[in-house]
């Protein structure tokens, strides 16, 4: 029994040594040489992807989807909205949220001053400015006020769910 086991082990060792399972050291230039070559003969199929392709096409639709949407629009002409408007809104402006932070909504403006609001370029910077104490006022408050949220399931003294981001808290607190 032991003899057959030893013979089987020797046979396996001999097979492994001849099989070259461990890769030999690769030529350093082999990878570099093959890097520029295209594996596909047809260059139209081997196009490299544009790095911005996903970002740019996020809000767009493909040509097939556009054709289908146009056919559906023609079939149901009594739609309330136009699909072309959604294609124009491709990406949100990066500053849109920041710009609108300190602004008052139009409803508040109409209620405050009963005068028709004139959109002057002079008045815009005044509205864009954020209240100096707005961040400090919100410092210790709960961020999520939904009673059914996951954060509320922790204990009452848990700091999870509180706005404890102190990066801008001490800005402007220095001597004047």
Swiss-Prot record:
Keywords per UniProt: Signal
Write out the GO biological process terms. Answer: cellular response to carbon dioxide; negative regulation of nematode pharyngeal pumping; thigmotaxis
Residues in the signal sequence = 1-19
Covalent S-S links between cysteines: none
Q: What happens when the gene is disrupted?
A: Defective preference between different food odors.
| Keyword set includes Membrane | no
List the biased-composition ranges (Basic and acidic residues).
61-79
Is this entry keyworded Signal?
A: yes
Please list where the region (Disordered) is annotated: 59-79
Question: What is the annotated role of this protein in its UniProt record?
Answer: In AWC olfactory sensory neurons, required for the detection of preferred food sources.
The molecule here is called Neuropeptide-like protein 1
- Give the species this sequence originates from: Caenorhabditis elegans
The taxonomy runs: Eukaryota, Metazoa, Ecdysozoa, Nematoda, Chromadorea
- Gene for this protein? nlp-1
């Amino acid at each position: 029994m032991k003899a057959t086991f030893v013979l089987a082990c020797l046979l396996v060792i001999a097979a492994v040594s001849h099989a070259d399972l461990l890769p030999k050291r690769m030529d350093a230039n082999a990878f570099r040489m093959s890097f520029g070559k295209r594996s596909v003969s047809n260059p139209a199929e081997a196009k490299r992807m544009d790095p911005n392709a996903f970002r740019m096409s996020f809000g767009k639709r493909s040509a097939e989807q556009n054709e289908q949407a146009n056919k559906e629009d023609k079939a149901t002409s009594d739609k309330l909205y136009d699909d072309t408007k959604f294609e124009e809104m491709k990406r949100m402006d990066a500053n849109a949220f920041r710009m609108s932070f300190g602004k008052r909504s139009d409803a508040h403006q109409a209620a405050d001053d009963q005068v028709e609001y004139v959109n002057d370029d002079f008045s815009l910077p005044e509205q864009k400015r954020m209240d100096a104490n707005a961040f400090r006022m919100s410092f210790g408050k709960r961020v999520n006020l939904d009673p059914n949220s996951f954060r509320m399931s922790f204990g009452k003294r848990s700091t999870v769910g509180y706005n404890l981001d102190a990066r801008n808290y001490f800005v402007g607190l220095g001597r004047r």
